[in-house]
Regions:
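Residue-level marker of regulatory loop/turn positions in helix-turn-helix DNA-binding domains and
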Residues: 84, 88, 106, 139
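N-terminal helical cap/lid subdomain that shapes the substrate entry/recognition surface
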Residues: 1-91, 112
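Generic structural signal for secondary-structure transition and capping sites
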Residues: 82, 101-104
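Asp-based, Mg2+/Mn2+-dependent phosphohydrolase catalytic module
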Residues: 1-3, 97, 104, 110-219
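Catalytic-core regions built around general acid/base machinery
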Residues: 91-100
């Protein structure tokens, strides 16, 4: 039995073309340039290395740079006027409302950023909870520890969750814990359970899953 429908936030609830994450990326580079006093090229290289080695720039800073305050970083990179990038999405609100399963947000960002995005999209009232990067002790996706803490917070097993994400990399650790995985904005289902063209197409997949729970091994 499924108990939670878990959504990533950025570029899952709104399309990549919105350009918001690109702007956050620009601000991540700016933070590294200004606070670590790196030339732009080195900042870019460091960001890439953190992404490959630690999953996110934040995780890289937390692990390798105890002199950097993660809260200062998180505030800086998300300090963006969201209304320039996003607007209300009544169809998304309607879609979420039509799914009876409790919905939660699982994001590498902060709860403030998540609440701001949900408010601009007009879907804040559709989510039972927001698990942000603070609540998993700054262990970002795709590190396995983030997903283990998520399950612990929700008091569920992986196979009781459906995880919706725009990133294959962030779905795989969930799948390894037994979650049913839905990749948004992709036609490449090779490594995940389902892939859909856009967020509204999640609805029929979830509806079918709720009608037909997956086979379980019985002891
Ligand atoms: Mg995302």
């Amino acid at each position: 039995m499924y108990r939670f429908l878990i959504f990533d936030l950025d570029e899952t609830l709104y399309p990549r073309q919105a350009g918001l994450m690109q702007e956050i990326g620009v601000r991540i580079n700016r933070y590294l340039i200004e606070n670590l006093r790196l030339p732009p090229e080195q900042a870019n290289e460091l960001r890439k290395r953190y992404y490959n080695q630690h999953g996110t720039a934040l995780r890289g800073l937390v692990v390798e740079r105890p002199d950097v305050d993660p809260e200062d970083y998180l505030h800086f990179v998300h300090d963006i006027p969201l209304a320039n990038y996003l607007g209300p999405n009544p169809l998304l609100a309607q879609m979420l409302r039509s799914i009876s399963l409790p919905k939660v947000i699982f994001t590498n960002a902060t709860i403030e950023h998540a609440q701001n995005v949900l408010n601009v999209l007009g879907v804040a009232d559709q989510f039972a909870d927001i698990i942000d990067v603070r609540r998993v002790a700054y262990v970002s996706k795709p590190n396995a520890g983030a997903y283990e803490q998520l399950l612990n917070i929700l008091q569920v097993r992986g196979d009781e969750c459906i995880l919706v994400e725009d990133s294959v990399r962030n779905l795989l650790p969930g799948k390894a814990l037994g979650m049913t995985t839905i990749l948004v904005d992709s036609e490449d289902c090779a490594e995940v359970d389902y892939c859909v063209h856009d967020i509204l197409s999640v609805k029929p997949v979830v509806a079918a899953l709720l009608r037909q729970p997956p086979d379980r091994l019985t002891s």
